[in-house]
């Protein structure tokens, strides 16, 4: 089974996360940030991952912004994806998906390469706050996820006006691309999808 669990506790955040890559899109998400909960629920649904997440951060009682929590949730999710994939035998490795979200169009391309990298081209300046969520943290979320999952990730907004729609398109396209990339290629069962024989940096 391709599953992973992480408990991450720091002076800034307390996070418990379980992940099943071969689930049915079920989720129980509680970060105390409504918009982030909504996006992670969409990520689970469109990737068919089962995700159970409870997260608390210093923004709840110290008057901090939720920067630490958002980044640490992404770190935890990335680590779980990497752990659950294990040796990556037989996976398709690559994923690409474009999502039209009303007036916005967003594409996510990724490679589970073991060489983490992020290209992020999206203009989220139209609305800097969505509830308790700082929209500028979207790029930091996906950077932390990519670097901890070992993914080369390119996110491109082709066009869009509504910041909510653009971010939702990002999460949905990421989910669909991940679903493609982690799926098993029946012609490559038991094989590492790399001419080098490994999927990691160096």
From Swiss-Prot:
EC identifiers of the protein = 4.2.1.19
Recorded protein name is Imidazoleglycerol-phosphate dehydratase
CDD domains, from UniProt?
IGPD
Annotated SUPFAM superfamilies: Ribosomal protein S5 domain 2-like
Q: Name one GO molecular function term.
A: imidazoleglycerol-phosphate dehydratase activity
Q: What is its main location?
A: cytoplasm
Which PROSITE patterns does this one have? Answer: IGP_DEHYDRATASE_1 (PS00954), IGP_DEHYDRATASE_2 (PS00955)
Record's signal peptide: none
